Amino acid sequence: DARFAISANYTGKKGADASVGLLNDDNQEFFLTKVEYGSPSWQVSAAFASKTNGNTYDGYYHTSEGKDYSGKDLASIGLRAYWKPQETGVVPSVQVGFDMASVDEAADTNPDEMQAWMVGLGWNDLLIDGNKAGLAFGQRQHATSFKGGTKTKAYEEDNFVWEAYYTFKINDGVSVTPAIFGGEDLEADGHEVDGGVILTEFRF
């Protein structure tokens, strides 16, 4: 049966400072809440995040401009959904995600709007029982609008990444997964970065 759930989280980056404390206008605060509805075979969810007073972060899943914003507050929304078929085989499970964020009082020439998205497909028991396959593609968090309309190094924001894999189940304790991946090079216009990897798993 479908169920409904809600969760929330609050963090004060300067909460340990006695002159600032929690829930204060001078604090660098982070608030996250998520609402979801669904069952083990499907689900939809929406999350809202708010960062105040220039509270920034470091992370890998973004472009340089998507991270290096400068403003007072940041508000973002994330939408997610997944669906799994009742039977395994040719029909894949599907996952989709979309994020968007806006910066309040962004500095001139800095990003004031950002987005990210992804699509993922997964197959269980594809071709042979026990084997799996997956395909995913999307764009990392990237700037879509700059205050004043100025945008430098546009290729850094026009990013696209993808990956694909197939898992061979050798026996109950051993599996081999070759995978390939690629994406646009954020350091050079018109260049791409491609690669491959082979993962061997042993289970005892």
Segments (PLM) and residue ranges:
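Outer-membrane beta-barrel "beta-signal"
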Residues: 192-204
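Transmembrane beta-strands of outer-membrane beta-barrel pores
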Residues: 10-14, 39-41, 48-54, 98-104, ...
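Long, well-ordered mid-to-C-terminal structural blocks that present hydrophobic/aromatic surfaces
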Residues: 38-124
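Repeated loop/turn-to-beta-strand initiation elements of outer-membrane beta-barrel proteins
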Residues: 2-8, 16, 31, 40-46, ...
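Aromatic- and glycine-enriched pocket-lining scaffold segments that form the walls
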Residues: 1-36, 160
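Membrane-embedded beta-strands of outer-membrane beta-barrel proteins
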Residues: 33-35, 79, 119-121, 164, ...
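C-terminal hydrophobic structural anchor segments
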Residues: 122-172
